[in-house]
Amino acid sequence: MPKGRQKVPRLDARLGLPICLCLELAIFFLVPQVMGLTEAGGLDTLGAGGLSWAVHLDSLEGERKEESLIQQANAVAQAAGLVNAGRIGELQGHYLFVQPAGHGQAMEAEAMRQQAEAVLAKHEAVRWHSEQRLLKRAKRSIHFNDPKYPQQWHLNNRRSPGRDINVTGVWERNVTGRGVTVVVVDDGVEHTVQDIAPNYSPEGSYDLNSNDPDPMPHPDEENGNHHGTRCAGEIAAVPNNSFCAVGVAYGSRIAGIRVLDGPLTDSMEAVAFNKHYQINDIYSCSWGPDDDGKTVDGPHQLGKAALQHGVMAGRQGFGSIFVVASGNGGQHNDNCNYDGYANSIYTVTIGAVDEEGRMPFYAEECASMLAVTFSGGDKMLRSIVTTDWDLQKGTGCTEGHTGTSAAAPLAAGMIALMLQVRPCLTWRDVQHIIVFTATQYEDHRADWLTNEAGFSHSHQHGFGLLNAWRLVNAAKIWTSVPYLASYVSPMLKENKAVPRSPHSLEVLWNVSRTDLEMSGLKTLEHVAVTVSITHPRRGSLELKLFCPSGMMSLIGAPRSMDSDPNGFNDWTFSTVRCWGERARGVYRLVIRDVGDEPLQVGILQQWQLTLYGSTWSPVDIKDRQSLLESAMSGKYLHDDFTLPCPPGLKIPEEDGYSITPNTLKTLVLVGCFSVFWTIYYMLEVCLSQRSKASTHGCRRGCCPWPPQSQNSKEVGTALESMPLCSSKDLDGVDSEHGDCTTASSLLAPELLGEADWSLSQNSKSDLDCPPHQPPDLKDGQIC
């Protein structure tokens, strides 16, 4: 064999392959560990029981500062019998020294600890050092001792994770609705129930049915006046009291306005919508017109005015938040566009989905629905667990709350969480945040369409399912939208026939740039159409509105049970499906008769288009969408981050004040006391004057002058004629005619009325009293 060459073993030799495999495996496992020691991530490769020290070295000067520090750290670690595991995170000059492998015995470890401590304590390059100990940390989670909380799947669904409102993470960050008051406008709230009593707000409550401050529900024959109490429990039921359940905003205050347990008028509704509107922030209204599939109704003139006034003046000018349920007429083919409360631009219209995310049998659909949240569904699915009244057959807790009546309070509670982190959200800010953060939920019945601005909407689910985490994180960084801009078209006279399907009537209106210049309206929020249509069967009409982008809204759905022969008289339909789209362009209203009966043809008499929106441009909307998505990690959801809030307006609580019975009783008592004191004072004055007159009577022919009644003298009224002195009282004075001297005869003519002066002269004449000179008088006296 030539010198200098060695025999290399072949890979297929008997032991060659196993050796190579072992080497490769060793490299695979050991290299990452060795490399990991040079990074902060290498700390995870150390045994839990290994020794380690955090060491802060004195900083060095020079261009190669970092390299010098690493060399110094290696030297110090070696001197201490340790290994430099690398810099700790991004902290300059901070390094982790760890125990070398192979010193796992207790005695060896203790000896190494003492050696390391001695070296590090005396080394001149070490500024600070600390042996690392295992720290005990626990994930922050919410635990309640309320017995029914595990059954509140809508708050924390353990059976089907993700099918809930995603609120526990918000609670963990101490966002519970603190500082916010929600009022339930309903049939009363039993505020003495232990789940509600600690959070009850008497200042925000009132009973409009009995006209007193206490909204306590009254027992009824049907045992049905528990509705408001159940809704209140959903919002603010107190946690950790070992009773029933927990509210979604359990740190908020809850008030009640009792108005549905008796006759209801337009004026009562108006009072309810604005009652204590500087105390109450959110009005939860789980009621509306009959859900019978044939009613077209809503707030009347005063109710509409109160809603508008509430969003303008309520909550110190930021606007009251009105949350309304979309309705439970689904089994009657009803539609919430025929409900004026759900149709209003001033309300947050909330629908329902069941535990599986499907539209329940009772739920209504409409183009004005903003969002949905959870409620009960079919009998096989769970309903909402909440507080109940304990009157009559109630136990204080129920597992059977359902309907959109149960969905609206959940939305109100989530809005309370939003207002805690951002109290200055306006009523339109709340609507915008819902639109921007609601999540699309799969349902085969949902007709999801994405509009020009990128928002997806369905007539069944609105913009989607409310998510408390997304709502609160968005609210935390939200800056207010621009002012509300609007455009109203002229009243468009048509008088055109409505043909039967498949034909249709189509009318157009073009909104130009010039039309929008004055208001500055650029992008849409709500679009409203007011129509007057005659038709022998109202339920056979179908109305669709197309925005300039082509987005279709079914604003008037056919209803099989609506046989009203009067059609529509200035009824306003609205849609939110064009939210964020450009306002300028051609709007198309398409109407057709889908009935199968040979009836008289309907007539579109007139219609009017109203646009609501803001000066935001499409680019502004895109930027806001991006900003909100960046906040969904929760990085801003802490107390150290707060955007400044503008001060609210100082608005009086109410223009008028309803006098309560207790106040009236107090006023009556005060009035009676005032009358008594007045009479007493008058008697006292009268008696004192008589006593004075008897004490200071005519002495030596002289009497006090002038008389006590100065008012009579000043205004020139006649004084009653009365003798000033008798002949017996005069001392050294001619008294021949003294008994006929009267006050009226002694007064100057200018102090008497004409009749009194004549009377004075006549009485002198009748008595034939000759004039005589008065005696010498002291000042202020006559005789």
UniProtKB/Swiss-Prot annotation:
The record marks 140-141 as: Cleavage. Residues 688-783 are cytoplasmic. The keyword Signal applies. Residues 37-140 form a propeptide. Residues 152-472 form the Peptidase S8 domain. Its main location: Golgi. Residues 1-36 form the signal peptide. Widely expressed. Highly expressed in colon and spleen. The active site is at residues 186, 227, 405. Residues 141-666 are extracellular. The chain crosses the membrane at residues 667-687. This is Proprotein convertase subtilisin/kexin type 7.
